[in-house]
Amino acid sequence: MNSIADSVSTALHLILDVDPGLATIVLRSLAVSATACAIACVLGLCAGAWLGVARFPLRGAVLTLLNTSLALPSVVVGLVLYLLLSRSGPLGFLGWLFSFKAMVLAQAVLVLPVVTALTRQAVEDVERAHGDHLRALGAPPLLRSLLLAWDERFALLTIVITAFGRAISEVGAVMVVGGNIDGFTRVMTTAIALETSKGDLPLALALGLVLLTVVLALNVVLSLLRRWRVRRDAARAATAMVPDAATPIPAPLPQPVSAHGRTLAAGTPLFTLRAATVRYGPVVALDGITLEITAGERVALVGANGSGKSTLLRLLQDLQAPAQGTVARHAGLRQAMLFQHPFLLRSSLRHNVALGLWLAGSTWAQAWRATPNALQRVELGHLRDRNARSLSVGQQQRAALAQAWARDPDVLLLDEPTASLDPHAKREVEALMEAFAAPRAERAMTLVFSSHNLGQVKRLASRVIYLEHGRVLADLPADRFFNGPLPEEAHLFVKGERI
């Protein structure tokens, strides 16, 4: 017992006196792990973000290989690297074996799968929930992955900290390729193992206490970051639930003649669907739909949940390919889509709107100059420098509408745009929809929107399409839909018995 107490006392003295030998080992450990973590994070964050959005034939096999690599024992990794770096190995000419570089390589190889897998999961979760918004703006996969990774930068920071903790706690690989040479390649974990086996408990205990302190500090930082994020998200959620202030309902504002130098006369076919079918596995979401949508129409898609409204909008926006049939679009058609839950990046409103314009083909300077006017149209000009995630739900929807409107589209697709809004915010968005659809400069503007609100459909639509089980059961002018005879299923829906 006295021996243990003496060892602990000596270990504490080594730490408090900043023993040179102890300090050298600690600093070398931090340098190796920090360098390895930096290399692994540069590669892993990029690879993981790309894997989160990319779709290719062998993706499943790649993910299986990635997940398998997470469970590789560190000594096996060290053995493989030893064989590669040995004099007779293919990388022996580098002369890295039993060096600082070999240990950095070993830890980087161990940490890389962790960073890649965690980053992929974080980005893929956001892509699955909100990726359609960026796709509708025209963001290609690589840019989408970078935008989503940047938007999840808090999660990425926690991944980096986790990776460093994994690296500095590793022992097997660095011992095999580093050799644990005193004064050259000895790090905390290997020194603890060696000094314990030699019976030098004070130094082993001192290094163990320092290592535990480093790991504890990393976990404290992670805990504080999580608590801060929970509080921040709760505050933003509370803000989002606050009803919008009673800002004036915007009047229809004249919009400049199309920036792309042409007009679409009323009646011009924009979309032509021929026997279009969409399947999600065994489920038929759209079943042989044939219809045409022309310029100047205000088309409402109605039907019960799961009837195919959102899928039809995604098909029109080219976010979904038909399994059978065809979808033809007018040449050069400019379109934009608004979702029930818009996705705005954790950046200013102005940045979000400018991003939409930039993706539409404007230079960043042009997009930046155009955003104040776009935000003013939706009565958000005074909030242009606010973080988009700090706004209320209604303000976020109006911001997304500004992002779509600024692109000067010929047709605006909206997926239940007012479903989650308070009454005043609903009226504001409806007024903006009417402003968009108002004819101007001989140019017919087109709306296609889905809604469960039949009062809204009466106010806004010139044509109503009723869907059930992926089929069009009624396609009529709005007056005839609400006042004329209907198929029994549509009649029950209008009466409120098939919601």
What residue spans do the PLM features occupy?
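Helix-to-loop junction immediately C-terminal to a conserved catalytic motif
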Residues: 317
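Conserved ABC ATPase "signature" region
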Residues: 140, 365-383
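The feature captures the beta-strand-to-loop junction immediately N-terminal to the Walker
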Residues: 302-304
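C-terminal transmembrane helix and the adjacent membrane-cytosol boundary/short C-terminal tail
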Residues: 114-130, 135, 147, 205-257
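A short, surface-exposed alpha-helical micro-motif characterized by mixed small hydrophobic
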Residues: 457-459
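Catalytic Walker B motif of ABC-type/P-loop ATPase nucleotide-binding domains
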Residues: 412-415
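Conserved ABC ATPase signature
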Residues: 387-391, 395
